[in-house]
């Protein structure tokens, strides 16, 4: 939790625009996880979910509060973004905020299961791309090539089209 606060506070210091600040924060978070030797060491939240019967009610409550706090932090970022950049499609911001938590926790689990520390980084960057496309103004999106289009593919389309 502390690392999320530090990362997104730093991003807010770097950029006043709420969308750009959130995108910078996600990129910084991905970079931090990419720099961890051997990937993220694990996730207490995921462990508690899978082994719930091994933990007492106090630990389960702390887990719930931590998740709610993380979701609320993401929700505040998304509210600030939506106030400036209306979403491309109607979407519940609580769902989008929870998705960030799911991406991070799920990315940690996927990285461990697949023995590939890059999975977490790719999941965060994928969520970042989704947020960018969902909240970017339409005219800005019109100037961007579709995802996964390389310069060579783009040039081939122009020549053959």
Describe each PLM feature range.
Residues 1-4, 18, 22-25, 66, ...:
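Hydrophobic/aromatic residues within well-ordered alpha-helical segments
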Residues 9-41, 88, 93, 97-100:
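Hydrophobic alpha-helical connector segments
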Residues 15-19, 56-59, 63, 89-93, ...:
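Residue-level recognition of alpha-helical structural elements
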Residues 20-22, 37-61:
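Amphipathic alpha-helical segments used for helix-helix packing
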Residues 32, 36, 101-118, 130-140:
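Amphipathic C-terminal alpha-helical segment
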Residues 41-47, 88-110, 126-130:
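Hydrophobic alpha-helical segments that form the core
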Residues 52-57, 67-96, 132-141, 149:
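Hydrophobic alpha-helical bundle segments that form small-molecule/ligand-binding pockets
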Residues 137-161:
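C-terminal effector-binding regulatory domain of bacterial HTH transcription factors
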